[in-house]
Swiss-Prot record:
Gene name tied to this protein: PGIC
Enzyme class: isomerase
Protein name (Swiss-Prot/TrEMBL): Glucose-6-phosphate isomerase, cytosolic
MF terms in GO: carbohydrate derivative binding; glucose-6-phosphate isomerase activity; monosaccharide binding
Enzyme Commission number(s): 5.3.1.9
CDD domains: SIS_PGI_1 (cd05015), SIS_PGI_2 (cd05016)
Catalytic activity, reaction form: alpha-D-glucose 6-phosphate = beta-D-fructose 6-phosphate
Length: 560
């Protein structure tokens, strides 16, 4: 990406918004919501989706100013650079091309002068062929039994994204039918409890293990891979590994050394960041093994639909751009540090944890892309739970405590509708009644005057008063098919990118995860030498020394 030492906060567009905040402080959502023309202008439709951001603390004037900020940040140019394969991940000198992972076969997207779409489809075709062999039973395990159970080993982006999609599809009628008789589990944590939970009830004879590590050196993933290799070889012998383990990796030498046939390794590329990799073999392979490639291809098409919308739609009607600009407004101008992601769909229970990583690992930065300290806050603390569970958990704080902008995600048609005779509404209507009510409750609140008219006792009025003026947006999906899941993923991926582009940071590196890894190496060496040679603790501060001493004295780890 072209470098510039100017910070976005030095621009007139940023300063204009800073001054505009004083006007917003005098405005309540109760008043903004009376303007029907404003509300209508804040409804956006695309490909079956409906976005309503009228409950944001933003008059039309605010949106105009945010669009000016997008121009000042050269957002159009930055989006083009991403799609054109320029090395916008400057600290690692890499392109950022997760959009190529779901591009149509005839698309042209170049990295370093080479069309990468053909490479992507070569891998997708290989996944399709392999998954069909496994699912049909033409590929069997070492003892001749079909491989109906899959454990995918990965961590971070190699785990959270595929788990989100898997959980979203489990109860989709088409996907459910395709997955009959099959299981897909995800192993991420090096805590041995996670291993134990994953292998409970599984037979090594019918289990296929997918090891996801680009370099085949990721510490946690490879330890878990060795653990499951031991589980397989103990039951079936060392030769069974080639039949029961495959890899998603580019390091074919280490794949072969591990005991996996390099022909059963599925590639991905340096221009795919881990948290953006769910549309690569990282996600497509395990998901295709569970649901069949045809279902997963619909997921890719949904994401591609949003990619094209993001690339070509004017900003005032561009869903990811509008969402990204509103997040910048909430974080950097209104001072809201967090965002609640609230899907009114149990099938989306793993969506917030995935977006938590996509957002916080991407935009949790303190310096500009040129290395300058930022004089403003970036990034959001993302969290969430499905409705209505969250209402009985943390909504109390959202309504009467800190102001936390909320994303409400609703589904028109339930994956698994239930209609009970004698009930006023269906189960899904009951759920969606809350989806429609909560944003208004946050926006309007309840005044002391209203409570007095309801004859609420004076001593309870302060406790039952709701300030309102709490921003939210609503995103309504027609249903939750594989296609819609792809749409939802891409909207949030691009929203995060827009925020980073406006803030002038690198949303595609993650140096913050490295320091802890380095320090863990020192601890690991100490644990090994203390357990095997009785070496005294050395080189740690008082606090860490005390904790390590207690751990070594009381843990029951065997001598190695």
């Amino acid at each position: 990406m072209a470098s510039s030492t100017a910070l976005i906060s030095d621009t007139e567009a940023w300063k204009d918004l800073k001054g505009h905040v004083e006007d917003i402080k005098k405005t309540h959502l109760r008043d903004l919501m009376t303007d029907a023309n404003r509300c209508q202008s804040m409804m956006m439709e695309f490909d079956g989706l409906l976005l309503d951001y009228s409950r944001q603390r933003a008059p039309v004037e605010t949106m105009d100013k945010l669009l000016n900020l997008a121009k000042a940040a050269q957002l159009t140019e930055k989006i083009s650079r991403m799609f054109n394969g320029e090395h916008i991940n400057s600290t690692e000198n890499r392109s950022v091309l997760h959009v190529a992972l779901r591009a149509p076969k005839d698309a042209v997207i170049k990295a370093d002068g080479k069309n990468v779409v053909q490479e992507v489809w070569n891998v997708l075709d290989k996944i399709k062929e392999f998954s069909e062999k496994i699912r049909s039973g033409s590929w069997v395990g070492a003892t001749g039994k079909p491989l109906k159970d899959v454990i995918a080993i990965g961590i971070g982006g190699s785990f959270l994204g595929p788990l989100f999609v898997h959980t979203a599809l489990q109860t989709d009628p088409e996907a459910l039918e395709s997955a009959k008789g099959r299981q897909l589990r995800f192993l991420a944590n090096i805590d041995p409890v996670d291993v134990a939970r994953n292998i409970i009830g599984l037979n090594p004879e019918t289990t296929l293990v997918v090891v996801v590590s680009k370099t085949f050196t990721t510490a946690e993933t490879m330890l878990n891979a060795r653990t499951l290799r031991e589980w397989i070889t103990a039951a079936l012998g060392a030769s069974a590994v080639a039949k029961h383990m495959v890899a998603v990796s580019t390091n074919l030498a280490l794949v072969e050394k591990f005991g996996i046939d390099p022909n059963n390794a599925f590639a991905f590329w340096d221009w795919v960041g881990g948290r953006y990799s769910v549309c690569s073999a990282v996600g497509v392979l395990p998901l295709s093994l569970q649901y069949g490639f045809s279902v997963v291809e619909k997921f890719l098409k949904g994401a591609s639909s949003i990619d094209q919308h993001f690339q070509s739609t004017p900003f005032e009607k561009n869903i990811p751009v509008l969402l990204g600009l509103l997040s910048v407004w909430n974080v950097s101008f209104l001072g809201y540090p967090a965002r609640a992601i609230l899907p009114y769909s149990q099938a989306l229970e793993k969506f917030a944890p995935h977006i938590q990583q996509v957002s916080m690992e991407s935009n949790g930065k303190g310096v500009s892309i040129d290395g300058l300290p930022l004089p403003f806050e970036t990034g959001e603390i993302d969290f969430g739970e499905p409705g209505t569970n969250g209402q009985h958990s943390f909504y109390q704080l959202i309504h009467q405590g800190r102001v936390i902008p909320c994303d409400f995600i609703g589904i028109v048609k339930s994956q698994q509708p239930v209609y009970l005779k004698g009930e006023v509404v269906s189960n899904h209507d009951e759920l969606m009644s809350n989806f429609f009510a909560q944003p208004d409750a946050l926006a309007y609140g309840k005044t002391p005057e209203q409570l007095q008219k309801e004859n609420v006792s004076e001593n309870l009025i302060p406790h039952k008063t709701f300030s309102g003026n709490r921003p939210s947006l609503s995103l309504l999906l027609p249903e939750l098919t594989a296609y819609n899941v792809g749409q939802l993923l891409a909207i949030y991926e691009h929203r995060v990118a827009v925020q980073g582009f406006v803030w002038g940071i690198n949303s595609f590196d993650q140096w913050g995860v490295e320091l802890g890894k380095v320090l863990a190496t020192q601890v690991r060496k100490q644990l090994h030498s203390s357990r095997t040679q009785g070496t005294a603790l050395e080189g740690f501060n008082y606090s860490t020394t005390t904790l390590l001493k207690r751990y070594l004295e009381t843990s029951s780890e065997p001598q190695m």
